From Swiss-Prot:
InterPro entries: Brix (IPR007109), Brix_dom_Rbsml_bgen_prot (IPR023548). This is Probable Brix domain-containing ribosomal biogenesis protein. Keywords: Ribosome biogenesis. It comes from Methanosarcina barkeri (strain Fusaro / DSM 804). HAMAP family: BriX (MF_00699). Residues 1-157 form the Brix domain. The keyword rRNA processing does not apply.
Amino acid sequence: MLVTSSRKPSARTRTLCKLLSRFIAGRCMTRGKMGMQELLEFAEGGPLIVIGEYHGNPGELSFYDEAGELLFSLRFTDWYSKELDSYWFSGIEPKLAGQGEIAEAFKVFFHFQRVENDKIDQLPPSSTLIVVGENDIDFMGSGKSLFKLNLRGFKKY
């Protein structure tokens, strides 16, 4: 899975690109002048996530399948925990928790193991978890929130 940015990303967008790719055990790449076809070639037959900007800050995630079809997009504002600086990413795929249309879209796109909300406490302490709520998506590691996307919009194509 490839995570990339807009053509001229800000420092915050590059940071989110790196964090997201490390969290989902994917690859991060600076886009530069590449078009969609070239990005799909670099994705090596896998799905693609493009981080777009709004006023110089990361503000949209667009999710593409292997053929380059846009599946869905999220508009958001981001938040980072101070715990993030000292967190070591294991490279293991995270688990997925949550209900609703966005959680279902994530399940289809990522193919991560789904965990029921009432079973989150039973996960091993070193687990990474994506918790999809109605208003936010929380990326958790070792039981703590590492970064969060506060949702502003969701569009399915």
